[in-house]
Curated annotation (Swiss-Prot):
Organism: Conus victoriae (Queen Victoria cone)
Recorded superkingdom: Eukaryota
Post-translational modification: Pyrrolidone carboxylic acid at position 1 has no significant effect on the structure of contryphan-Vc1.
Primary location class: secreted
Modified-residue entries (Pyrrolidone carboxylic acid), positions: 68
Region annotation Disordered: where it falls in the sequence: 25-50
Comp. bias (Basic and acidic residues): 25-44
Prodomain positions: 24-67, 99-103
Compartment annotation: Secreted
Disulfide topology: 70-83
The protein, known as: O2 contryphan Vc1
Length: 103
């Protein structure tokens, strides 16, 4: 137990000195050094999103592969990444046109 406690104290002391050394050499960022936040408003005052971001978002939302077309009675669950059964499929198994009635 004594060796483990000493080892823990030495590790804590090393970590604290490392943090102090990093803190001494730090300086404040200027506006040029600050990272550009993705999706932030334009800096030129016109508002809206940059053209590249709009183009990227349109590509994502219009691509059929991103929507993952599933067979009738199933819907794509983006969290699971698979097609999952819908409630209407459970209520009306084997008849996905139940709303139209029998024709």
């Amino acid at each position: 137990m004594g060796k483990l406690t000493i080892l823990f104290l030495v590790a804590a002391a090393l970590l604290s000195t490392q943090v102090m050394v990093q803190g001494d050499g730090a300086h404040e960022r200027t506006e040029a050094e600050e990272p550009q936040h993705h999706g932030a408003k334009r800096q030129d005052g016109t508002g809206g999103y940059p053209v590249d971001d709009v183009d990227m978002m349109q590509r994502i939302f219009r691509t059929p592969l991103k929507r993952q077309w599933c067979q009738p009675g199933y819907a794509y669950n983006p969290v699971l990444g698979i097609c999952t059964i819908t409630l209407s499929r459970i209520e009306h198994p084997g008849n996905y046109d139940y709303r139209r009635g029998r024709q």
